[in-house]
A protein has these predicted regions:
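Terminal substrate-recognition subdomain of acyl/acetyltransferases
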Residues: 1-16, 150, 154-175
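Acetyl-CoA-dependent GNAT
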Residues: 2-4, 15, 24-98, 107-109, ...
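Noncatalytic regulatory segments and standalone regulatory/sensor domains
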Residues: 169, 305-306, 316-318, 322-328, ...
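Conserved catalytic-core motifs of GNAT/GCN5-like acyltransferases
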Residues: 125-126, 138, 143-160
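Active-site-adjacent substructure of cysteine-protease-like catalytic cores
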Residues: 266-343
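Conserved hydrophobic beta-strand within the GNAT/NAT acetyltransferase core sheet
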Residues: 88, 122-126
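Active-site nucleophile-adjacent alpha helix/oxyanion-hole segment immediately C-terminal to the catalytic cysteine
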Residues: 171-231, 236-252, 303
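Short glycine/proline-centered loop/turn elements that form peptide/ligand docking sites
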Residues: 107, 130-133, 150-155
Length: 401
């Protein structure tokens, strides 16, 4: 529990008799936090409801600095189940108390809160025209890794910054091609969205990300039924869709049994899923895709990434979303301890793309989540450009076998 009196050497620009406290934010602080929002921001202000949710129900930590009983600044840090990623969700200092080291102290406290939850990255967004904040972050060791266009209500861009917190491994994930991010637009298109990201990384000039391709890939690879509602996509259908577009693809799965069959109860639905699956298997025979009856460890995936392949992996969503549904993600990089993952699902309004990109997940944790259902189904695709494409650019064969 954070409850620290600020040391004398950190009291720059403050009256000598001021009492300064850094502590956890509480619901009773919400009126003061709303007043700071009003004074700091012309648009995109947090509401009372948002503050209450973030301080009481969300997977988040609120921090405030208090001067002689008055809240003068705050930081909100959100965390993401199943990952080692934190986000500086919101951060503000009352204009009348700037230049006193408040922002620097709150930022350091936010980083410590992230470390205490075993997070290795803290990410944030900042307005491109907020020069003072950008200077603060860069002096604190943050690096820019992207831009959101038209992000704020007034259409200003947001710079995306991140800082690595204390992990002794490589300073950046080791990976092959740079994988762009695409957010799924329908509940049942995680598989197509994951496949789109991988294909775009390998053949950027040939693949155009958008809903037309997302829905087309779903039509080509859906199991028709799965759990409830529209069917999702299985490994065999996704592999066929990739092979049709000229990619080399390996399917790593224990056997050729119909996947997700235990997710439906109706015998009629089960029969339809079997017919669809048998048709996929027939088409695979002449597609160039390879079925390998084995499963990949997290280290196998890391090795494949280092060799230029892109793994698309089936996981159970429970460890991230606390709901049991099958979900596809893309492995974008690896280091000695973590796999880094693009998750196409942005779950609710309190999350953004930045929360789902290159999510660091400990390898042991990833192996536990990379299985689904009572049958503990494990499935992964390794996607590469065709052999002729790799030979032309001198790339190495990235086989994980």
């Amino acid at each position: 529990m954070l409850d620290n009196t600020v040391s004398s050497d950190s009291r720059q620009g403050l009256p000598g008799d001021a009492t300064i406290l850094l502590r956890q934010a509480q619901p009773a602080d919400i009126p003061a936090l709303l007043a700071i929002e009003e004074r700091c921001f012309a648009t995109d202000r947090l509401t009372r409801r948002s503050f209450h949710y973030l301080l009481t129900k969300a997977k988040a930590t609120g921090l405030v600095e208090v001067h002689s009983g008055t809240v003068v600044g705050y930081a909100l840090v959100s965390f993401h189940s199943g990952t080692s990623l934190a986000r500086l969700y919101s951060f503000a200092v009352d204009p009348g108390h700037r230049g006193q080291g408040v922002a620097k102290r709150l930022l350091a406290a936010a980083e410590q809160a992230a470390r205490s939850r075993d997070c290795i990255y803290l990410r944030l967004e900042v307005r491109r025209d907020n020069a003072a904040a950008i200077d603060l972050y860069k002096k604190a060791g943050y690096r820019e890794f992207g831009v959101y266009t038209d992000y704020y209500e007034d259409h200003m861009e947001a710079l995306r910054l991140e800082k690595r917190l204390g992990h002794s491994g490589p300073s950046a994930p080791l990976g092959g091609p740079l994988v762009p991010y695409y957010q799924q637009t329908l509940d049942f298109t995680c598989g197509p969205s994951a496949l789109m990201m991988a294909m775009k990384a390998l053949k950027p000039a040939e693949i155009e990300l958008g809903r037309k391709l997302e829905i087309r890939l779903w039509r080509e690879s859906t199991t028709v039924f799965m759990t409830s509602g529209h069917g999702g996509c299985g490994p065999f259908g996704l592999a066929l869709a990739a092979a049709r577009r000229g990619f080399a693809v390996d399917i790593h799965i224990k056997d050729n049994a119909t996947p997700f069959l235990d997710s439906v109860r109706s015998d009629e639905k089960k029969e339809v899923m079997r017919i669809v699956h048998e048709d996929f298997l027939d088409e695979l025979e002449g597609s160039g895709a390879t079925v390998r009856h084995n499963t990949l460890s997290a280290q196998d995936m890391a090795d494949a990434v280092a060799g230029g392949a892109i793994p698309i992996v089936l996981i159970s969503s429970y460890r991230i979303y606390h709901e049991k549904f099958p979900h596809w993600v893309v492995v974008t990089g690896a280091d000695d301890r973590f796999l880094y993952v693009h998750d196409p699902l942005v779950y609710d309004r309190h999350h953004a793309h930045i929360d789902r990109m290159n999510m660091p997940i400990p390898k042991a944790d990833f192996e536990r989540m990379a299985r689904y259902g009572k049958a503990q189904l494990k499935a992964a695709l390794l996607l590469r450009p065709q052999l002729s494409d790799r030979a032309a650019d001198g790339s190495a064969d990235g086989s994980a076998d």
